[in-house]
């Protein structure tokens, strides 16, 4: 091998490792593009190793206090932000989200999903504000809850036919967790259940489905995946996923659909500064597929953040509505 290079976000840790050959170069990830251009001009075999812990894995370890958690957070001052999108281009991060203001579409950082990589601040922008704190302040109170208890819902019987539920959303938001929660709850009640998760190659932000079937006994469930036209309830954690052809094709004519109006940005938002989620078109598409009164939409992410301080509880809000 003519040349070996390690690129990492923590070069000091690689330097401290024993067993690294003396001819192996170690560089910060900021030099990745220059290193790639350098290696392509070398005749022969070269090796480029990129060392960085997955963002989702960092979040898991931080929850278990097994990975350093920087005591700082980044915010974007929307009064200064001009919506140029350079922060998105620098970071390729979907936690940099659009926010509508009186002066047009600006940028904001979703504090519930931010992995504290901080590459967004490398953009040429004075609107970033660094706050040195470990935890966000939780809401002290929430005014607006209705008084009294709602009417007790009528729970359909599972004696003659199973209940088929599809949860659709994006990776990293708890779609699989919600499917597992429903399956375990049914199991604890002594009911038969089948749960199948469809994540495919989805990473954080990719499309994810969880198919949940509940029945009084196992013989009522003939297939693990919900067949086309057989879904009774669709919990749409993301409106873009819920309004897709793949989701709509599973619905029964009498299906009930609960959809979160707060859509997550897609890859197109990074590439196009003027991208916006076509929520109105998606809701119209759902209305055309679902009978009147069977579609419920709500800003679940905003409710979860305002009431509980974190949008990670969005799916539980939708489950409660269902």
Show where each model-derived region lies.
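Beta-strand segments within the central parallel beta-sheet cores of soluble alpha/beta enzyme folds
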Residues: 7, 105-108, 194-199
């Amino acid at each position: 091998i003519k040349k070996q290079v390690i690129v990492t976000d923590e070069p000091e840790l690689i330097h401290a490792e024993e067993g690294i050959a003396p001819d192996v170069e170690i560089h910060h990830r900021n030099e990745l593009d220059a290193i790639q251009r350098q290696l392509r001009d070398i005749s022969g075999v070269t090796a480029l190793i990129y060392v960085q812990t997955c963002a989702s894995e960092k979040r898991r370890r931080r929850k278990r206090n097994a990975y350093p958690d920087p005591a700082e957070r980044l915010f974007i001052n929307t009064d200064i932000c001009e919506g140029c999108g350079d922060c998105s281009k620098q970071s390729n991060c979907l936690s940099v989200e659009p926010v509508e203001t009186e002066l047009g579409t600006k940028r904001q950082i979703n504090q519930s999903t931010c992995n504290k990589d901080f590459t967004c601040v490398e953009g040429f922008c004075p609107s970033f504000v660094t706050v040195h704190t470990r935890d966000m302040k939780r809401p002290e109170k929430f005014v607006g809850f209705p008084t009294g208890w709602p009417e007790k819902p009528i729970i359909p019987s599972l004696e003659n036919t199973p209940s088929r539920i599809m949860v659709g959303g994006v990776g990293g938001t708890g779609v699989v967790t919600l499917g597992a929660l429903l399956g375990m709850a049914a199991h604890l009640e002594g009911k038969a259940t089948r749960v199948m998760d469809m994540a495919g190659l989805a990473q954080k932000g990719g499309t994810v489905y969880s198919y949940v079937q509940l029945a009084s006994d196992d013989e009522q469930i003939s297939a693990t995946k919900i067949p086309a036209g057989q879904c009774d309830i669709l919990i749409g954690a993301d409106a873009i996923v819920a309004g897709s052809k793949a989701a709509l094709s599973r619905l029964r004519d009498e299906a009930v659909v609960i959809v979160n109006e707060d859509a997550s940005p897609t890859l197109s938002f990074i590439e196009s500064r003027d991208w916006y989620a076509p929520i109105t078109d998606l809701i119209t598409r759902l209305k055309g597929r679902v009978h009147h009164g069977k579609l419920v939409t709500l800003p679940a992410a905003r409710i979860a953040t305002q009431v509980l301080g974190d949008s990670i509880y969005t799916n539980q809000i939708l489950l409660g509505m269902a």
